[in-house]
């Protein structure tokens, strides 16, 4: 039977999805299933790994059924996943010894403070590219080893395995035969030396984590093993794997130095491919691993905006200014400018490049003429201003002047936001035809690994641009608007602006 399709398993923070693509990179079928969020204490977040597997495997079966596709028609299966989330399981039984500790979970903050006191902060920054934070996997692993009865003894006896969600899914798909991860996911553990591309013995010793529990790191574009869907049909290669943001970067074909994408979700994730050079940031950005044109290791700078789409939710849920997120464009266009109104959405502090956890939100520049439309417009503009903050930081760190910004995520449907993003950054913004770029990245990697597609050059014809937004304001207007933003930010932080 001719193999006409590749499948992407897209395992996210709140739901598991399966997306089937044909040879022209069209979406043939999608299946999605939500799973439980577990909050045992304030600041703690967990998932049930078995529920994640059940939700993911059921969407795989459902997507095939919806498309009327037989498993023998599938060339390969790729994986993209929520990053950092940590699972430890028994090697013999395959059963988790504790719930998955989710990337959002802050329980291991005291462990981070201990590492900071012991002087590891600079070492972690220089060798892993990350900041010392509970966000990453390392201190989550240590917490499980310290707090689950018998865990440390089992780990030291070689009876436990660790994985981020990609590793867990491959283990389950291959019925316990394969224990692997890829460099993009490994680079988010705070245990992986991104320069030597190996697990870091200094950090393993500092955190008292046995190396025997760690997965083998294989390329992002490779065949890891084989699976049968629901135990039926022929064996399908499990091939191609990347963490969600790196997968979106590859799905947008940002495979060369200086190419960047911004994902507009609850927050915003901006990644710039820096090629073979691991750029150390002086502006609070993360240095991480990306995927190059042949599936090889490239590096990237990563910055995140805490409040993107969440700012629009605030307008709707707390202020009642809109009924639906889609309404924002209509109201923003009812006024010709922001009338001097700026919203700084520092509801949970500000991330890069400010890193001010104590900052809080503010509406700045209100006059008697300010109205609902100006506030809604200011909320949309704030998303673009924060993205410019990140882009400017990336330009300073990398020395690369961006020419184009590829975009994805729910908010890219907002034409006003996309045009303002182009205007305020003086960069062309490209919106893709297929917005499922995270899943598409995993599909591309899986297809390339088995020869379903021959090269990334071939893929450039598959991943088209739906619309380009070109900068349409003068330089002096752009800089006046941005100066207003910087002054607004200065009112909620300790920064001063001339």
Curated annotation (Swiss-Prot):
GO MF terms, alphabetically ordered: ATP binding; glycerol kinase activity
List of residues binding ADP: 13, 17, 266, 309, 410, 414
Record: residues binding ATP: 13-15, 266, 309, 313, 410
EC nos: 2.7.1.30
GO cellular component, one term: cytosol
Associated pathway: Polyol metabolism; glycerol degradation via glycerol kinase pathway; sn-glycerol 3-phosphate from glycerol: step 1/1
Entry keyword Lipid metabolism: no
Role noted for this protein: Key enzyme in the regulation of glycerol uptake and metabolism. Catalyzes the phosphorylation of glycerol to yield sn-glycerol 3-phosphate.
Protein name stated in the entry: Glycerol kinase
Gene that produces this protein: glpK
């Amino acid at each position: 039977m001719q193999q006409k399709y590749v499948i992407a398993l897209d395992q996210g923070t709140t739901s598991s999805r399966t997306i089937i693509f044909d040879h022209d990179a069209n979406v043939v079928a999608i299946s999605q299933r939500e799973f439980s969020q577990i909050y045992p204490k304030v600041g703690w977040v967990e998932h049930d790994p078995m529920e994640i597997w059940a939700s993911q495997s059921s969407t795989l079966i459902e997507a095939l059924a919806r498309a009327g596709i037989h498993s023998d028609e599938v060339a390969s299966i790729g994986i993209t996943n929520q990053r950092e989330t940590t699972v430890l399981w028994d090697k013999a039984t395959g059963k988790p010894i504790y719930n998955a500790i989710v990337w959002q979970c802050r329980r291991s903050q005291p462990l981070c403070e201990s590492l900071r006191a012991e002087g590891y902060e600079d070492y972690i920054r220089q060798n892993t590219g990350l900041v010392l934070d509970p966000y990453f996997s390392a201190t989550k692993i240590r917490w499980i080893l310290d707090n689950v009865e018998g865990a440390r003894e089992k780990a030291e006896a070689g009876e436990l395995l660790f994985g981020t969600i990609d590793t867990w899914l491959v283990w389950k798909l291959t019925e316990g035969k394969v224990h692997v991860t890829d460099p993009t996911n490994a680079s988010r553990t705070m245990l992986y030396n991104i320069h030597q591309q190996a697990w870091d013995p200094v950090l393993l010793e500092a955190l008292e984590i046995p190396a025997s529990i760690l997965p083998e790191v294989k390329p992002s574009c490779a065949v890891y093993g084989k699976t049968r869907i629901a135990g039926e049909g022929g064996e399908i290669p499990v091939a191609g794997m990347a963490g969600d943001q790196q997968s979106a970067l590859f799905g947008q074909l940002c495979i060369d130095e200086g190419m960047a994408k911004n994902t507009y979700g609850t927050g915003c994730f901006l990644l710039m491919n820096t090629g073979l050079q691991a750029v150390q940031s002086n502006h609070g950005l993360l240095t991480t691993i990306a995927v190059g044109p042949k599936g090889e290791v490239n590096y990237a700078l990563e910055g995140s905006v805490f409040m993107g789409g969440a700012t629009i939710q605030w307008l709707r849920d707390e202020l009642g200014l809109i009924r639906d997120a889609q309404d924002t464009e209509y109201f923003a266009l009812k006024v010709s400018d922001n009338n001097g109104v700026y919203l700084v959405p520092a509801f949970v502090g500000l991330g890069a490049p400010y890193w001010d956890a104590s900052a809080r939100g503010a509406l700045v520049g209100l006059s008697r003429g300010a109205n609902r439309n100006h506030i809604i417009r200011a909320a949309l503009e704030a998303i673009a201003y924060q993205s410019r903050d990140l882009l400017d930081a990336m330009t300073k760190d990398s020395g690369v002047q961006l020419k184009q910004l590829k975009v994805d995520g729910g908010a890219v449907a907002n034409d006003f936001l996309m045009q303002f993003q182009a205007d305020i950054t003086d960069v062309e913004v490209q919106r893709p035809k297929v917005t499922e770029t995270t899943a598409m990245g995993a599909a591309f990697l899986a297809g390339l690994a088995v020869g379903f597609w021959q090269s990334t050059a071939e893929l450039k014809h598959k991943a088209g641009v739906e619309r380009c937004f070109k900068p349409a304001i003068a330089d002096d207007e752009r800089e006046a608007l941005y100066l207003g933003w910087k002054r607004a930010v200065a009112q909620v932080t300790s920064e001063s602006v001339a």
